[in-house]
């Protein structure tokens, strides 16, 4: 039985009860994708991108949740942990549900990245990450309820916790300030 107290389910219920036909995974992917493309962390710009996916302007409760999500992501991307926490169903959800959400997360990421990358030059490694995300978004139905399927899911999820950081460090991470010249 799925954990009704999980952040994913709570966010899904909030979105659904406010008439937004989108999953938390897709919204989180959108946010991470746009952030990794260098969109910055301006709340109004994030809310404008999110409103396209939500299909309507968010009310105050959803708006506040989206701003909170952005603050969490900002902290993760700017920390030294070198991993992000994916907003996905908990481990007690059916593997098919988790795999579907993983694919939706990747679709959201690709959309967010595409809306904000604006023709930036990418390294070969960054292009490989984007190709991987496209492939993962399309194979969500391929995982079977088995130990191998579970293992494959965990492997992909671990990859997605670190791979976007390559894009963020390449395109969005602020450069370290140059040392100030000293006066002699």
From Swiss-Prot:
Gene Ontology CC entries for this record: cytosol
InterPro entries to which the protein is assigned, alphabetical: YgfB-like, YgfB-like_sf
Pfam families tied to this protein: UPF0149
Top-level taxonomic group: Bacteria
NCBIfam families: PRK02166.1
Family: Belongs to the UPF0149 family.
Name of protein: UPF0149 protein PputGB1_5261
Species whose genome carries this gene: Pseudomonas putida (strain GB-1)
């Amino acid at each position: 039985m799925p954990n009704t107290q999980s952040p994913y389910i709570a966010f899904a219920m909030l979105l659904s009860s406010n008439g937004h036909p989108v999953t938390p995974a897709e919204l989180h992917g959108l946010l991470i994708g746009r952030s990794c493309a260098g969109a910055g962390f301006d709340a109004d710009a994030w809310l404008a991108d999110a409103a396209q996916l939500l299909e309507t302007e968010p009310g105050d409760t959803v708006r506040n949740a989206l701003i909170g999500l952005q603050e969490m992501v900002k902290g993760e991307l700017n920390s030294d942990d070198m991993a992000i926490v994916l907003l996905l169903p908990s481990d007690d959800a059916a593997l098919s549900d988790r795999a579907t959400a993983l694919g939706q997360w990747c679709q959201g990421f690709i959309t967010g990245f595409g809306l904000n990358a604006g023709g930036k030059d990418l390294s070969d490694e960054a292009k490989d990450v984007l190709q991987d995300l496209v492939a993962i978004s399309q194979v969500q139905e391929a995982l079977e309820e088995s130990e191998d399927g579970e293992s494959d899911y965990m492997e992909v999820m671990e990859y997605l916790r670190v791979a976007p950081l390559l894009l963020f460090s390449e395109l969005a991470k602020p450069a370290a300030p140059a040392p100030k010249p000293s006066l002699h």
